[in-house]
Amino acid sequence: HAEMLVLQEAAKTYGGTRLVDCDLYVTLEPCAMCAAAISMARIRRLYFGASDPKSGGVESGPRFFSQPTCHHRPDVYGGIDELRSRTMLQEFFEVRR
């Protein structure tokens, strides 16, 4: 849930929790919890590399931004350099195990 950490740091840096002029770049599709935090922070655009059919919450699973309870929907660009993102994630977790 690196998105949560980044949003917290950005809020400290910019002096507020509304990050309306900010874009977020991540390697993996955010989960539903992180998608909710992205929405609450009013992130302008979300870019992610690899889709996550198992735990994703943007284009997979609950599709948080498509729910009627979602009050802010960032522009979403998924699948950016997906193969490279997937490879980076696999290599990262191989080292961790």
Indicate where each model-derived feature is located:
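Zinc-dependent deaminase
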Residues: 17, 30-97
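A contiguous binding-surface segment within folded domains or other stable secondary-structure elements
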Residues: 12-14
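Acidic helix/loop or adjacent segment enriched in Glu/Asp that either coordinates divalent metal
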Residues: 1-9
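Immediate flanking context of iron-sulfur cluster ligation sites
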Residues: 16-28
